[in-house]
């Protein structure tokens, strides 16, 4: 069965796309820690990020870097933090979160409530 991220990539579930190329897709998180919280996923469905072959993993980080630079341009923040957790969705992904302080990358804190606008 396809992961929720594969369904998003295939357009079966709507998303707010930030960037895309032939191997990766970046979109806004539906339960963000901060405005601009973005997920970067490989189009190839791989459960565990450390099972991704070295070349694709390096390319994923380069893609994530480009997305992070764009986020930092669009969202006023000190830096863009990066996290990999991998327990909630069985499809490897990187979280990119605009940060003002270290505590902004706390996944246990309450998520933002955003409108559809």
How should these model regions be labeled?
Residues 1-117:
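HIT superfamily nucleotide-processing domains
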């Amino acid at each position: 069965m396809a992961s929720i991220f594969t369904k998003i990539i295939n357009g079966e579930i709507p998303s707010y796309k930030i960037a895309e190329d032939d191997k990766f897709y970046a979109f806004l998180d539906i339960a963000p820690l901060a405005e601009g919280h973005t997920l970067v996923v490989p189009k190839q469905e791989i459960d565990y990020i450390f099972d991704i072959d070295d070349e694709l993993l390096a390319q994923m980080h380069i893609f994530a870097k480009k997305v992070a630079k764009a986020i930092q341009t669009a969202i006023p923040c000190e830096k863009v933090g990066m996290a990999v957790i991998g327990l909630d969705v069985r499809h490897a992904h990187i979280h990119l979160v605009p940060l003002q302080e270290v505590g902004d990358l706390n996944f246990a804190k309450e998520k933002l409530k955003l409108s559809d606008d």
